[in-house]
């Protein structure tokens, strides 16, 4: 899988919050987006995940995300906010399963969900921590989750 952004900019009113950002990240790669508070990191990620309007191009395996319907996109990509935004203490498995809500709906049965969660836990090497409270994870483990 490859996620690419080309010349992405985000406006809030007349103020440009994100200016001309480009990146590409593929399976097995990590991408670090860093900067001071207010630099636009979360805004960029919100745009890439289709939560905010933007100019430029964001593609997943070469397909413009704006052309993808929400459900097929949610099957391939989800964004989970920072842990500080979570109001309750969940297990690792519960947090990973939250990524499936956009795919299936909050109150819908989740056929194949357990297998998808297991694959995700294995992909980030957290399968042995599945029942552990997220507040007990190290910083690196939280990032992988």
Question: Each PLM stretch: what is its role?
Answer:
Residues 30-32:
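Short beta-strand immediately N-terminal to the Walker A/P-loop
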Residues 34-36:
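The feature captures the beta-strand-to-loop junction immediately N-terminal to the Walker
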Residues 56-64, 73:
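Conserved ABC transporter NBD signature motif
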Residues 88, 105, 130-131:
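Signature (C-motif/LSGGQ) region and adjacent switch/coupling loops
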């Amino acid at each position: 899988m490859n996620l690419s952004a080309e010349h992405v900019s985000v406006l809030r009113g007349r103020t440009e919050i994100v200016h001309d950002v480009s990146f590409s990240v593929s399976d097995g790669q990590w991408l670090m987006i860093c900067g001071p508070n207010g630099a636009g990191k979360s805004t960029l990620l919100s745009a890439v995940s289709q939560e905010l309007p933007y100019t430029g191009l964001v593609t997943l395996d070469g397909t413009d995300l704006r052309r993808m319907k929400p459900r097929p996109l949610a099957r391939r990509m989800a964004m989970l906010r920072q842990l500080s935004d979570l109001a309750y203490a969940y297990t690792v498995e519960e947090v990973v399963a939250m990524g499936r809500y956009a795919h299936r709906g909050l109150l819908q049965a989740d056929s194949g969900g357990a297998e998808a969660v297991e694959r995700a836990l294995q992909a980030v090497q957290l399968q042995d921590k599945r029942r552990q409270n997220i507040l007990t994870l190290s910083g690196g483990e939280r990032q992988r989750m």
